[in-house]
């Protein structure tokens, strides 16, 4: 009877406890308690101020309860906080007492289907679960409620935990340095994937049901950190964010942003999921440890998701069944009527006295069509995640078709136009070019000393006074005045002029003044010669010689005599050469018969020229015998010597005394 009375009292409180407080969208646990924020990250309330070391956090969106663990509490390890009415923000229920085997709870996650709370303990290296609706009894009555889900090795540090309720999977992180990993397991604890490659001290982890991915944070080597992402099978890994000098501990996504905690500077960061460079700090204060972004994701937005439809339907059936039971108990003790009525086939959740709407409706009473005035220039449809989506007209884009596709497309005052196929094109202003008019034709540094203007889509330069060149890069006075003339700028005409020296005149000091005495009829020369003193007529200079100088006539005669002498000697040598006796040239032919030994190539007869033997031994060849050449002999004698030598038995050498001696 006592337990029934408690249940009835609790049911009555649920019915009459209609939510009057401001709705919160985010909650952050800090050293000074639990802080509640609206969608603009303005703090609207706080609670649990007696807790200063909250280590883990989970949320029940059906009953709107927060579950958390505090490291320093001596008696209990899990607590709950009711977030429905404002006056309940400070009402904390003690759910699970500590025991001798209790370890340091590092992660909490809530399963709406089985209404179980899962957690990881660092000291016991274990994953546990418990049915939360059975908690709150005396300590000795909770021993049999706790279920051991998984036991990991001692060299594993369980750091965080999350649940994919739609596909019924658990994910936890192992932050031990040598064995760091991301683990995917079944709800009964059976490990399905243990991803270790390039994982270093992972910490907080969360499931993004909007994109079917998981996010986790890693404390990298030294000062670095990363926020990593992978699909639900822990594949297709991507580094979402990289940075330094921060200590990220927790991560939580919504449809557009990813929120993560930096314990180094006590900040909560908001980073756009589509562009990680777009980030801002939404909270800075007491040391944050965990956060939850409340979006009604499971019950409100996953009703049409094929992967979640069956699970969500079963959750709603459980809520309907429980609401009927609570309603019957409440009507038995009070005649107070229902405070709200759900429209458009909405379901009343008696636990929270609020409506669970169909996908097409929203609002407190499900009175607002979700597509009502949502699309500005397009048609609205309800997506698989129960969110409104727009099919925009050809000229518009954006989440709500509220932006013309030409807005901001053409830069630098370019005009945008649409083709028949909906393609954008730009007509650029005079000084710009490119597909979006993004390129300036005249840049600031094109003309060095002048003003740039566009002529036929080509940059041109109007030079400042005193400069010239295609890009005004040359000073006009450079090498302008010749013959050491001085270049100056005329202040009246703004043109350069030359101040010439005493010997020159002309526009550029190019005319010698002595030429001005010549009357050549050149008008250009005459205009520069006006006012120039006329010099005397040019005459042939008189040459005088000193008395002690040399006599050139003597020199010329000496040179002529020497040349004549050389010529005479040359003639005499030539004549002497012509009259010298020639060397004899004797040719004799030998006719070779069949009885003669062959000494040459086969032919009718073999011939040999005597002079061809001159390259033989000097004793065998008379033509190069130096003694014979020096001996005075008549031509007939010399010829006879050669003939005798050829016919000798020795063959081809002469019977000279020197050669005979050499033979002996």
Swiss-Prot record:
Instruction: Give the protein name, as stated in the record.
Output: Protein cueball
Q: Which family does it belong to?
A: Belongs to the cueball family.
Q: Where are the transmembrane segments?
A: 553-573
The way this protein sits in the membrane is described as: Single-pass type I membrane protein
Q: Where are the LDL-receptor class B repeats?
A: 115-157, 168-211, 212-257
Per the record, ranges on the Extracellular side are 22-552
Disulphide-bridged cysteine pairs: 371-380, 375-390, 406-416, 410-426, 428-437, 477-487, 481-498, 500-509
Glycosylated residues, chain numbering: 40, 140, 188, 431, 491, 551
The chain's coiled-coil residues are none
Species of origin reads: Aedes aegypti
Q: Name one GO biological process term.
A: canonical Wnt signaling pathway
Q: Which GO terms describe its cellular component?
A: plasma membrane
Question: What does the UniProt entry say about where the protein is found?
Answer: Cell membrane
The entry's function note states:
Has a role in spermatogenesis and oogenesis.
GO molecular-function terms, A-Z: Wnt receptor activity; Wnt-protein binding
| Signal peptide range in chain numbering | 1-21
InterPro entries under this entry? 6-blade_b-propeller_TolB-like, Cueball_EGF_LRP_Nidogen, EGF-like_dom, LDLR_classB_rpt
């Amino acid at each position: 009877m006592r337990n029934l009375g408690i249940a009835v009292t609790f049911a009555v409180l649920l019915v009459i406890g209609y939510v009057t407080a401001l709705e919160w969208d985010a909650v952050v646990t800090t050293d000074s308690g639990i802080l509640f924020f609206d969608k603009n990250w303005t703090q609207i309330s706080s609670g649990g101020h007696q807790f200063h070391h909250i280590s883990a956090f989970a949320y029940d969106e059906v009953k709107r309860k927060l579950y958390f663990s505090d490291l320093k509490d001596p008696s209990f390890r899990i607590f709950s906080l009711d977030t429905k009415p404002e006056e309940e923000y400070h009402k904390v229920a003690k759910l699970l007492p500590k025991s001798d085997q209790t370890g340091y709870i590092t992660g909490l996650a809530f399963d709406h289907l089985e209404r179980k709370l899962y957690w990881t303990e660092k000291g016991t290296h274990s994953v546990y679960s418990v049915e939360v609706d059975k908690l709150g009894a005396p300590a000795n009555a909770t021993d049999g409620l706790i279920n051991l889900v998984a036991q990991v090795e001692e060299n594993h540090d369980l750091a965080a935990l999350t649940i994919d309720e739609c596909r019924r999977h658990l994910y936890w992180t192992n932050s031990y340095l040598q064995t760091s990993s991301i683990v995917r397991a079944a709800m009964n604890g059976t490990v399905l994937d243990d991803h270790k490659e390039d994982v270093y001290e992972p910490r907080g982890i969360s499931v993004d049901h909007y994109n079917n991915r998981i996010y986790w944070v890693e404390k990298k080597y030294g000062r670095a950190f990363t926020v990593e992402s992978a699909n639900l099978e822990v594949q297709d890994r991507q580094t979402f964010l990289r940075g330094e000098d921060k200590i990220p501990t927790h991560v939580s996504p919504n449809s557009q942003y990813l929120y993560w905690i930096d314990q180094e500077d006590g900040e909560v960061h908001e980073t756009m999921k589509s562009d990680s460079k777009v980030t801002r700090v939404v909270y800075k204060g007491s040391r944050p440890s965990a956060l939850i972004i409340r979006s009604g994701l499971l019950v409100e937005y996953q009703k049409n998701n094929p992967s979640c439809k069956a699970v969500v339907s079963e959750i709603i059936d459980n809520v309907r069944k429980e609401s009927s039971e609570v309603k019957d108990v409440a009507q038995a003790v009070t005649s107070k009527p229902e405070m709200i009525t759900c429209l458009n086939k909405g379901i009343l959740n008696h636990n929270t006295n609020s409506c669970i709407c169909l996908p097409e409706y929203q609002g407190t009473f499900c009175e607002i069509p979700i597509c009502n005035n949502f699309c500005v220039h397009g048609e609205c449809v309800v997506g698989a995640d129960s969110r409104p989506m727009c099919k925009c007209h050809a000229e518009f884009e954006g989440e709500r078709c509220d932006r013309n596709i030409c807005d901001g497309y053409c830069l630098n005052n370019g005009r945008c136009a649409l083709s028949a196929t909906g393609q954008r094109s730009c007509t650029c202003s005079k000084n710009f070019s490119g597909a979006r008019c993004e390129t300036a034709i005249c840049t600031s540094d094109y003309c060095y000393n002048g003003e740039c203007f566009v002529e036929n889509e080509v940059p041109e330069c109007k030079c400042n006074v005193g400069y010239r060149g295609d890009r005004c890069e040359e000073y006009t006075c450079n090498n302008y005045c010749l013959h050491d003339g001085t270049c100056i700028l005329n202040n009246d005409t703004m043109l350069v002029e030359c101040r010439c020296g005493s010997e020159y005149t002309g526009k550029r000091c190019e005319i010698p003044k002595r030429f001005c005495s010549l009357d050549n009829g050149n008008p250009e020369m005459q205009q520069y010669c006006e006012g120039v003193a006329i010099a005397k007529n040019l005459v042939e200079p008189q040459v005088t010689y000193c008395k002690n100088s040399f006599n050139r006539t003597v020199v010329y005669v000496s040179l002529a005599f020497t040349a004549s002498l050389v010529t005479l000697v040359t003639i005499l040598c030539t004549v002497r050469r012509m009259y010298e006796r020639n060397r004899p040239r004797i040719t004799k032919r030998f006719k070779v018969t069949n009885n003669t030994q062959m000494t040459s190539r086969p032919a009718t007869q073999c011939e040999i020229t005597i002079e061809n033997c001159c390259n033989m031994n000097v004793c065998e060849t008379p033509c190069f015998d130096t003694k014979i050449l020096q001996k005075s002999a008549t031509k007939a004698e010399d010829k006879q010597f050669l003939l005798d030598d050829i016919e000798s038995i020795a063959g081809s050498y002469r019977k000279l005394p020197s050669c005979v001696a050499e033979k002996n």
